[in-house]
């Protein structure tokens, strides 16, 4: 996969935030964690992921460009916190008490589990499914699982199995 081109100013802002938060964590925790690798390989509606064993943060270049300062202020510390929690506590719940503590007490950032960025520009095709009470939009991955007979999905409200609305797909 080609590495997306990120404006140098955006990359510098990401790295400045990362280094500031890492230094803050090292001082607070009296540790000497090294700087993780940063790549811009994240795709889809996911803003970022922390690759624990690789000590790497992968960021979504499209969402970074569309939401620059909010992305840097929220996503970079969020993913760094995952790495720091893994280094300090090992495998624990992804957004559990250790992660919340790392975000709020160490990095001093509100502990939000998900972003609220607009994702229309990065969202893939969806497929309409129906139940007895509403319409549901399934991703292509979930749609293909239904087609292959690997799974079925149920409505959380009425409990009925979702059925593909073929008319809306034409």
Curated annotation (Swiss-Prot):
Disulfide bonds: none
Entry's localization field: Cytoplasm
GO molecular function, one term: zinc ion binding
One BP term from GO: response to stress
Primary location class: cytoplasm
Active site: 79
Source species, domain of life: Bacteria
GO CC annotation terms, alphabetical: cytoplasm
Family: Belongs to the SprT family.
Name the UniProt record assigns to this protein: Protein SprT
Organism the protein comes from: Pectobacterium carotovorum subsp. carotovorum (strain PC1)
Gene that produces this protein: sprT
């Amino acid at each position: 996969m080609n590495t997306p081109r990120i404006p140098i100013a955006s990359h510098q802002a990401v790295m400045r935030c990362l280094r500031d938060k890492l230094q803050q964590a090292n001082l607070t925790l009296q540790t000497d964690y090294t700087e993780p690798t940063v790549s811009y390989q994240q795709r889809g509606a996911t803003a970022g992921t922390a690759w624990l064993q690789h000590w790497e943060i992968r960021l979504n270049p499209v969402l970074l460009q569309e939401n620059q300062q909010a992305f840097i202020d929220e996503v970079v510390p969020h993913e760094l916190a995952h790495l720091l929690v893994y280094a300090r506590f090992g495998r624990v719940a992804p957004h559990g008490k250790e992660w919340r503590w790392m975000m709020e007490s160490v990095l001093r950032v509100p502990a939000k589990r998900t972003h609220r960025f607009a994702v229309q520009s990065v969202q893939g095709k969806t497929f309409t499914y129906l139940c007895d009470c509403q319409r549901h939009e399934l991703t292509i991955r979930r749609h293909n699982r239904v087609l292959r007979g690997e799974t079925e999905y149920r409505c959380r409200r009425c409990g009925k199995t979702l059925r593909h609305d073929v008319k809306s797909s034409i």
